[in-house]
Amino acid sequence: MAHHKGGGSSRNGKDSNPQYLGVKAYGGEKVKPGSIIVRQRGNHFWPGKNVGQGKDFTLFALAEGVVQFEKKGGKKFVSVIPNEQK
């Protein structure tokens, strides 16, 4: 008769890969178009002016300028203030 001994239970489980989430460009930093500003799960920060949002909720710059964080109506918005053209 074939037997299979029971597998032991895991105590600590597996170690998952790091996700590297968070703010990548802080307020006052200069960014170029396409620069990632925030990596997040869900909308912790919302896109403001000159900021786009990817399907994984990543916020990125649409224009060259300076990052600005602001609160409006209980939400945190991230905007990029364009550089003055000379």
UniProtKB/Swiss-Prot annotation:
Which InterPro entries does the annotation name?
Ribosomal_bL27, Ribosomal_bL27_CS
Concerning Gene3D superfamilies, the annotation shows: 2.40.50.100
Superkingdom of the source? Answer: Bacteria
GO molecular function annotations of the record: structural constituent of ribosome
Q: Which residues lie in coiled coils?
A: none
- Matches recorded under PROSITE patterns: RIBOSOMAL_L27
Q: Which Pfam families match?
A: Ribosomal_L27
Provide one Gene Ontology biological process annotation: translation
**Which UniProt key words apply to this protein?**
Ribonucleoprotein, Ribosomal protein
Residue span of region Disordered:
1-21
Q: Name one GO cellular component term.
A: cytosolic large ribosomal subunit
Kindly indicate whether the keyword Ribosomal protein belongs to this entry.
Answer: yes
Q: Which family does it belong to?
A: Belongs to the bacterial ribosomal protein bL27 family.
Matching entries from NCBIfam families are given as: L27
**This chain belongs to which protein, by name?**
Large ribosomal subunit protein bL27
Which lineage ranks, top first, belong to the organism behind this chain?
Answer: Bacteria, Pseudomonadati, Coprothermobacterota, Coprothermobacteria, Coprothermobacterales
